[in-house]
Regions:
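Conserved ABC ATPase "signature" region
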Residues: 63-64, 111-129, 181
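Catalytic Walker B motif of ABC-type/P-loop ATPase nucleotide-binding domains
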Residues: 159-162
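Conserved ABC ATPase "signature" C-loop
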Residues: 213-214
Length: 248
């Protein structure tokens, strides 16, 4: 389980998280929605120890992340796959080399084992036999799938997705959504997905949490969020230009 408890985080005078609390049980696909700059990416960076809270704390599998030693944090990160918004591939490396990076750093497999794991991961994202190609030869959607393959090659327990469908056309976005669902169903991973795309949120989420003014405004099932009576939540999910601030 992942648990963020009353997390506060500021950057200078800017308060980003102000009592953010969220629990993600094993097997769940939690989608975090919210306006640009609301702190969604900041929140999940606390899970892998890239940021430390000013107040509050974060637990993963019962371990308090801010208190972990460097070695313990490394071990924790080996269980967490992070899929970046823009794939974050190295252009000078082949697709196979990009996917193998984490495996080589981990040092648990020999070369044939790494090659087999890379091929397996690429097959899972429907990109077989692309190991010798380079990122510049692939479309944006294909590069995102390579980023996902790199994350799952380590066989993580958790997957964190940061805006996985940003910049993609609707058809390619639907492909990425189906892959996220596949990762949960086939690999049994617990996932947290950050997105602005409500179609994607409704497709992949088992629960959805809206981050607003530094804390969770509402968290519920897909239907509970879709039919929310909260004016702030409703304005966001329906894409309305204005809300009744008296009601908010």
């Amino acid at each position: 389980m992942i648990s963020l408890r009353n997390v506060h985080k500021s950057f200078g005078e800017k308060k980003v998280l102000q009592g953010f609390s969220l629990e993600v049980p094993e097997g769940e696909a939690m989608v975090i929605i919210g306006y640009s700059g609301s702190g969604k990416s900041v929140a999940i960076k606390h899970i892998v120890g890239l940021l430390e809270p000013d107040e509050g704390t974060v637990f993963v599998d019962g371990l308090e992340v801010p208190r972990l030693s460097r070695r313990e944090l490394y071990e924790l990160r080996s269980k967490i796959g992070y899929v970046f918004q823009f794939a974050a591939l190295f252009d000078s490396l082949s697709i196979g080399e990009n996917v193998a990076m984490g495996l080589r750093k981990q040092g648990l497999l020999d070369a044939p084992g790494i090659n087999a794991r890379v091929a397996e991961a690429l097959d899972l994202v429907d990109l077989p036999n692309v190991e010798d190609r380079f990122p510049a030869e692939l479309s944006g959607g294909m590069r995102k799938r390579v980023g996902l393959a790199r994350a799952i090659a380590l066989r993580p327990k958790y997957l964190l997705y940061d805006e996985p469908t940003t910049g993609l056309d609707p058809v390619t976005s639907a492909v990425i959504d189906e892959l996220m669902i596949r990762m949960r169903e086939k690999l049994g991973v617990t996932s947290i997905v950050i997105t602005h795309d409500m179609r994607s949120a409704y497709r992949v989420g088992t629960r959805i949490a809206m981050l607003y003014e530094g804390r969770v405004r509402q968290c519920g099932t897909v239907d509970e969020i879709r039919l929310s009576s909260d004016p702030v939540v409703r304005q966001f999910v329906e894409g309305k230009a204005e809300i009744d601030m008296d009601a908010a």
